[in-house]
């Protein structure tokens, strides 16, 4: 049994004031408590999800030499392929037992951001790969926009407070492959304990055991989504902005039991980032005598760079 509350986005999108109010209350309470929620009623169709899994499994099954051709130097892994074991959690030397791909923002009307963001990388071996990735990116971005609108209302802000900051934001869709484990890992996990950098994360593929979340009692609890649910969690940027009113909870992906070592695991997080200029200064209505300001002022772009250095993806 998962300890993570479930909510339905269609309640927020409905014309029913009580349903909308309850959604805001439930997601706000969950994010103030454990920092995670399981969300149904999102914009991903089963057909699109099935297509994406088919494409990413085909990509990760390519010969290593072909995959390595898509690993782009000098951009901190922001686009294209990142090979097995390259990323590690903050404070860890051991690389995580995973390889992954990054789809980034598709800027349409902002030449400055087109220049700032690296271009997406086209996989020539798989003609549908990029189109399916782009459509998934768009649907998750749309879902995230409405989740943030609900959170804005929970924080007594204008409903559209986040809209201008997330339009053309530096978001990332990351299909991850955790390959079969062939020998006992030395201190490495599929994904070591970490907090996410961004505003919120929308995770596809949390239906099986593996993802664990640390609760207030320092206990690791399973986070298991229902068949059509996304797992959504608060990232460090949103935690900073709200002076830790909304909790960015430490989580990890544990190694499977030995009898399952021969199996792959796939999961697909969407990291919702704002534009680099967004100030992450603590909101005034989240600071008072009982809750003094905990974080220095910083922009989203400067904070992201700090964290990429810590992860080993960008050199100082």
Predicted segments with their positions:
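Peripheral, non-catalytic segments flanking oxidoreductase cores
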Residues: 1-316
């Amino acid at each position: 049994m998962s300890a993570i509350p479930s909510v339905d986005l269609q309640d927020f999108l409905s014309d029913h004031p009580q349903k909308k109010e309850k959604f805001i209350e439930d997601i706000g309470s969950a994010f103030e408590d454990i920092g995670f929620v399981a969300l149904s009623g999102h914009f991903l169709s089963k057909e699109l999800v099935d297509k994406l899994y088919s494409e990413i499994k085909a990509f990760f099954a390519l010969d290593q030499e072909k995959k390595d051709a898509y690993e782009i130097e000098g951009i901190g892994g922001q686009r294209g392929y990142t090979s097995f074991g390259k990323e590690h959690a903050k404070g860890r030397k051991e690389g995580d037992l995973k390889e992954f791909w990054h789809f980034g923002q598709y800027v349409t009307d902002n030449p400055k951001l087109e220049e700032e963001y690296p271009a997406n990388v086209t996989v020539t071996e798989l003609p549908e790969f990029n189109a399916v990735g782009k459509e998934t990116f768009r649907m998750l971005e749309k879902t995230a926009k409405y989740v943030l609108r609900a959170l804005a209302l929970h924080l007594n802000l204008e409903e559209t407070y986040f809209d201008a900051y997330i339009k053309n934001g530096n978001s990332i869709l990351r299909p991850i492959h955790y390959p079969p484990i062939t020998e006992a890992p030395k201190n490495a996990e599929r994904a070591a304990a970490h907090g996410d950098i961004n505003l919120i994360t929308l995770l596809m593929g949390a239906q099986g055991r593996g993802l664990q979340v640390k609760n207030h009692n320092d206990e690791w609890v399973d986070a298991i989504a229902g068949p059509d649910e996304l797992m959504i969690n608060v990232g460090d940027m949103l935690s900073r902005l709200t002076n830790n009113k909304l909790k960015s909870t430490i989580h990890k992906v544990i190694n499977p039991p030995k009898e399952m070592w021969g199996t792959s695991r796939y999961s697909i997080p969407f990291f919702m980032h704002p534009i680099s200029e967004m100030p992450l200064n603590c909101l005034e209505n989240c600071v008072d005598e009982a809750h003094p300001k905990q974080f220095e002022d910083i922009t989203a772009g400067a904070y992201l760079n700090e964290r990429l250095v810590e992860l080993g993806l960008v050199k100082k």
